[in-house]
UniProtKB/Swiss-Prot annotation:
Native source organism of the sequence: Leuconostoc mesenteroides subsp. mesenteroides (strain ATCC 8293 / DSM 20343 / BCRC 11652 / CCM 1803 / JCM 6124 / NCDO 523 / NBRC 100496 / NCIMB 8023 / NCTC 12954 / NRRL B-1118 / 37Y)
Segments of skewed composition (Basic and acidic residues): 113-135
Similarity field: Belongs to the MecA family.
Region listing for Disordered, in residue ranges: 113-136
Name assigned to this protein: Adapter protein MecA
Gene this chain is encoded by: mecA
Subunit record text: Homodimer.
Purpose: Enables the recognition and targeting of unfolded and aggregated proteins to the ClpC protease or to other proteins involved in proteolysis.
Stored PANTHER family: ADAPTER PROTEIN MECA, ADAPTER PROTEIN MECA 1
Domain remark text: The N-terminal domain probably binds unfolded/aggregated proteins; the C-terminal domain interacts with ClpC.
GO terms, molecular function: protein-macromolecule adaptor activity
């Protein structure tokens, strides 16, 4: 296990499969058990925080980025001057697999999309990248938040959905998993979207928890390409 101090508020920990084996756990078992994942996070924190910078009363955020060699864990301390968006920017900068165009588009979408209190599917207009003449093209996106009973359902959805340019985040909130899906309407017909969502709902349900609640209070497990990463690891 290796650690790297990104800044005063964020630690990056590289854990390979042999480290996980020594701890008697696999990536699959870790992501499939919310009690294990929380215990694992804080055990790692206690090992790497040798200078005791992360006090017990600090609010701490974790993000896990699985790969075929193990995983990367980002541990971030939250305070008024260190907002969640800044922490996610730090993580993105260290994620070599994260396409830049997905990051840029998704950040804009997250600023403009809002989920209704009833957990409805939401549409919102978002500007695409600028044209050469300086004009912008607006297109609509569909946001859906799905509640999952367990991690195996996330694997089933990852292996079932066939939507191009899909942005997907996996959250852990109050012991349950949630998928935040952002679908560019220009890349899928309404009929296809309806059919794909029907497949997803075989393994989940539409969530009444809003994206704002997940963003502020949930644990972001996989960012932007959650379904792609899950499929590559567990298909």
């Amino acid at each position: 296990m290796e650690k790297e101090r990104i800044n005063e508020n964020t630690i990056r920990v590289m854990i390979d499969n042999s480290d996980l084996k020594d701890r008697g756990i696999t990536v699959m078992e870790l992501l499939g058990n919310h009690e294990k994942i929380e215990s694992f996070f804080y055990n790692i924190l206690s090992e790497v925080d040798t200078e005791h910078d992360f006090e017990d009363d600090d609010q701490v955020s974790f993000q896990i980025l699985p790969n075929r060699n193990g995983l990367e864990l980002f541990i971030s301390r939250l305070d008024e001057e260190n907002k969640i968006s800044d922490i996610l920017d730090n993580i993105t900068n260290f994620s070599s697999k994260q396409p830049a165009n997905i990051d840029n588009i998704s950040d804009k979408r997250r600023q403009e999309l809002r989920q209704s209190d009833k957990g409805d599917i939401v549409k919102s207009k978002v500007s695409s990248s600028d044209h050469k003449d300086g004009s912008q093209e607006n297109f609509e996106n569909t946001q859906v938040i799905l509640a999952l009973s367990d991690f195996e359902n996330a694997i089933a959805i990852a292996n079932s959905l066939k939507i191009e340019n899909l942005v997907s985040d996996l959250y852990l909130y109050e012991g349950a998993y949630y998928l935040n899906l952002l679908v560019p309407d220009h890349s899928v017909s309404q009929e296809q979207l309806k059919n794909e969502l029907a497949i997803a709902l075989e393994f989940s349900r539409i969530s009444h928890v809003t994206h704002e609640v997940l963003h502020e209070h949930g644990q972001l497990i996989l960012k932007h390409e959650a379904l792609e990463k899950i499929k590559s690891l567990f298909s």
